[in-house]
Amino acid sequence: MSDLFSSPDHTLDALGLRCPEPVMMVRKTVRNMQTGETLLIIADDPATTRDIPGFCTFMEHDLLAQETEGLPYRYLLRKAH
């Protein structure tokens, strides 16, 4: 799974930010991306383990991978539309 994180199109460093800031930054970043591009999100807020997958489901983007066993958390999403 780690290989998926090695070459994202965009990276968002949300370390030190707390809910709702990380998901708001993800939304703003995704809005400026092209369909099919990937975004690596790096975060340390425990709420992101719920919020990032929920955002992807609600906005119908693809959550390609997530690592939440230890800090920092990493998520890889692909913009679907």
Swiss-Prot record:
Gene3D superfamilies: TusA-like domain. Pathway: tRNA modification. The keyword Electron transport does not apply. The active site is at C19. Keywords: Cytoplasm, tRNA processing. InterPro entries: Sulphur_carrier_TusA (IPR022931), TusA-like (IPR001455), TusA-like_sf (IPR036868). GO terms for molecular function: sulfur carrier activity. GO terms for biological process: tRNA wobble position uridine thiolation. One of its GO terms (cellular component) is cytoplasm. It is found in: Cytoplasm. It comes from the Bacteria. Pfam families: TusA. Interacts with IscS. NCBIfam families: PRK00299.1. Belongs to the sulfur carrier protein TusA family. Sulfur carrier protein involved in sulfur trafficking in the cell. Part of a sulfur-relay system required for 2-thiolation during synthesis of 2-thiouridine of the modified wobble base 5-methylaminomethyl-2-thiouridine (mnm(5)s(2)U) in tRNA. Interacts with IscS and stimulates its cysteine desulfurase activity. Accepts an activated sulfur from IscS, which is then transferred to TusD, and thus determines the direction of sulfur flow from IscS to 2-thiouridine formation. Also appears to be involved in sulfur transfer for the biosynthesis of molybdopterin. HAMAP family: Thiourid_synth_A. This is Sulfur carrier protein TusA. It comes from Salmonella typhimurium (strain LT2 / SGSC1412 / ATCC 700720).
